[in-house]
Amino acid sequence: MLHNISLYPGLTEGQLCRFFPEKEATAKTLLAHMLKEGRIFCSENGRYYANQEVQSGADKDLSRCVWVLLDFIDQVEYHTVGEFPAAILCFANGELYEIVPIPQGKETMICQLLRQPQKDAGKRIVVVDDAAQIELLDIPQAAGFCTVAEDGTVSNYKKEAELES
């Protein structure tokens, strides 16, 4: 639990407990115990941090990417924080995946970064603010696109193949 709080600062109780499928009640108890012992801290907005100094504000993009990770956590063998522009790297079903957030207005910049040759680049799960952004994106190795609602609900999309004339 502490490892996840350190990796992904600013997550909610619901997100942290979902890392432990079928043990969510135990995870909730552990979270309360760690909070009481002063090993973790909870901000006024209900987000958890490993120390008080880090509580400067939750990273909205990271939080949305964690919701995507949690959507298939039962298939994930390993996960960790990624290197920009990927927020999270994970192995699932023997494949490497990068979960990449693309905020509105940053499409061109991030697409250019992702088109640079990369050694061992995995499949990319692209998290967008709005499904309309998908048509603006040309991303190599994109396994799929998704949006995340405020409540953590993930909606998945595939980019339609372009028709040849």
Predicted regions mapped to residue ranges:
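Hydrophobic residues on short alpha-helical segments
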Residues: 2-5
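Short acidic, hydrophobic short linear motifs in intrinsically disordered regions
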Residues: 7-20
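Short, cationic-aromatic polyanion-contact patches
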Residues: 12, 42-64
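Short phosphate-engaging motifs
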Residues: 12, 26, 132-133
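Intrinsically disordered, low-complexity N-terminal regions enriched in serine/proline/glycine
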Residues: 19, 47-48, 96, 156
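Short amphipathic alpha-helical interaction segments
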Residues: 20-36
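Long, low-complexity, charge-rich intrinsically disordered regions
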Residues: 63-165
